[in-house]
Amino acid sequence: MQNYYEKEVLITSTYADRRCEVGIFQAGILIQDAMTEFFHQYDCDAIQMSRTHQAVWAIARTKIFMDQDILWMDRIRIKIFPVKISNVAIHLNILFESLDGHPLLRARQELCAIDSVNHTLRRIDTTPFPMDLPPMEPVLTAPCRRMKLKLGPEHQLYTHTVRTMDTDMNQHMNNTSYFRLILDTHPSSFWDTWKVQEFDIHHVNESVEGEELCQEEPGALSAQIKRGETTLIKAFLLLTPRESA
């Protein structure tokens, strides 16, 4: 049984930002698509697994490292594979590379299975995922960053009401929508000066349609999205100045 999923992608408008390059939000979409296709080949993507085993995948943590700019009309190869499989979590690595094999982006994700009815944690062996799938060598060994954020009202930048188009097939906030909210804490002039080199996000709680989110951050590097006193996500962005800035 093949222990990875691989495909080629042409970077068109769907995957490019206002600077005609793959930003963190677009990278999140590409990673999410690849993850879905990876699980689909084992008959356990979210739709199939919710129907047959009443379970869905929940992303706990994601870390993305940008090695090189990915630009409009670049053709790239995306590869996703497991690096560790435990009783309660699957650890994936994702590699974006040029067609001649140069790394462009490396990422790691930690996922768990939760019950689609009561949202309790499920053991991986209660899903169709093949537990005997041999892991591969990681391409990103740096650990996910530990974040202890306790931000108050003085750090609030804006609020956002979750609406229909923010949600996915599980009727909860789509993971990539959080990426967009974080980037929207700063105007385009800021992102014309700085780009994200490294991005960590921890998904702590879910958000559903109609709930308000408070986007907060103490500076340019850390962000927290809260609903009242409940933390939904914590994120850290390592920035680097653009050469043209």
Regions found by a protein language model. Name each.
Residues S189-E217:
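A conserved acidic, glycine/proline-rich C-terminal tail/linker
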Residues I78-I80, L157, F199, Q215:
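Generic structural motif
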Residues Q2-K7, K63-L149, H203-E209, P218-A245:
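HotDog/MaoC-like acyl-thioester-processing domains
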Residues S13-Y15, M66-Q68, T164, D200-N205:
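Short, well-ordered turn and helix-capping elements at secondary-structure junctions
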Residues M1-I59, R106-R108, I114-Q197:
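Hot-dog-fold acyl-thioester-processing enzymes
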